[in-house]
Each structure stands twice: as C-alpha cells, then as structure tokens.
Regions:
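Surface-exposed beta-strand edges and their flanking turn/coil or helix-capping segments
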Residues: 25-27, 62-64, 94-96, 124-128
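Generic solvent-exposed, charged/amphipathic alpha-helical segments
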Residues: 22, 26, 30, 64, ...
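Hydrophobic ligand-binding cavity/cleft-lining segments
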Residues: 1-56, 70, 176
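Hydrophobic-ligand binding "helix-grip"
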Residues: 33-41, 52-108, 116
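Residue-level detector of alpha-helix boundaries and kinks
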Residues: 6, 10, 86, 126-133
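Residue-level signal for secondary-structure boundary sites
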Residues: 20, 89, 119-121
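A conserved amphipathic terminal alpha-helix motif
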Residues: 118-176
Length: 176
C-alpha cells in the first residue's frame, strides 16, 4: 500500500502581468530560488521548535529546490517544483508542487503553489502531521511564496528604473 500524500495550497496576488511573473520565475531560478527556500525552511524550523520538535530542529539541513520547465494549460502557466532536504532526508518529507501563474485581470496575477508531500515515519508520521506538522508545512509554503512574490516585484521595480548606463536593467536576487 502506498502512503497517501498530504496537500497544502497557498496563493498570493501579484500586481504584474502573468507573462512578467512567468518570465521572472524562469530567469535563473537556480540562482535565487534556493536562498528563498532556505529562509522559509528556517522559519519552519523555528515553528517546529515552538510546537515541541526541538530535537528535529537541531539537525542541520539544507534544501534543494528544482524548478522545471513551464507548461501552459489554457491561460495558466504551471512550473513543476521539487523541494527536498539535502541532509537528513529520511527525517523530512520531500515536497512536489505546481507553481501556478494565472491571470486575475489586467496587470494582476495569481501566483499559487499546490503542494503534495508524504510525512516520514508512516502512520505515526501522519498522526504527528495532522496534530501540528501540517500547519508548519502550510506556514513554510506561505513564507516561501510570499518571498517569491516579493522578489519578483522587487526585480520588476528595479527593471523600471533606468540603470547607470541609460537603459533599464533587471536582476533577480533574494529578497530579505
């Protein structure tokens, strides 16, 4: 019997066109996405400590985030995303998600993340997940997506300002 996945979803509105958001997401994601995931992951670790899982937090872990090529489905652009712990992998679930870019109207986009993960430790892990860890996963997902949206907005603002050389320039980097 295969373990049943848990689901989490979060979305944020971005005051940019879907094309601008999708372009920003696809622009060097290996450069800027991992840092955002690390920060969101750290926030999740702090929440784990608050709900009584301090021993888990003491395990130093980093995450690897992979963003796949986009696929268009009607007016929605979907990027497959995978988030895995690069250390302590058996203690932490991997997360598979769809990062969705959908129009909300002129110059407005819904950036959403629909995620699936299987809690570690079988049926015991599912009970623990229902008791507290699912809320930590949701908070981490929210933190990550908010950081992605902030980074895209910051890059858009930088692109609209003239650079020193007379043209507009944009560079995606991690938002604080």
């Amino acid at each position: 019997m295969h373990p049943r996945p848990m689901f989490a979803r979060y979305f944020v509105e971005v005051p940019l066109s879907p094309e601008a958001v999708a372009h920003a997401l696809a622009r060097d994601p290996r450069v800027w996405l991992p840092g955002l995931a690390e920060r969101a992951n750290h926030g999740g670790d702090l929440l784990l400590a608050e709900v009584g899982f301090g021993d888990v937090v003491r395990i130093k872990r980093t995450v690897v985030v992979e963003l796949g090529d986009s696929v268009r489905s009607g007016s929605t652009i979907v990027f497959p995303l995978r988030w895995v712990a690069s250390s302590g992998a058996g203690l932490f679930p991997s997360l598979d998600a769809d990062l969705e870019v959908a129009p909300l109207g002129p110059g407005r986009t819904q950036l959403a993340m629909s995620a699936r993960y299987v809690p570690p430790f079988g049926s015991v892990g599912r009970v623990i997940d229902r008791a507290a860890l699912s809320r930590v996963a949701e908070a981490t997902l929210k933190d990550f997506l908010d950081r992605v949206a902030d980074t895209i907005l910051m890059a858009s603002r930088e692109a609209s300002r003239p650079s020193e050389h007379g043209g507009a320039g944009v560079r995606l980097h991690e938002a604080g």
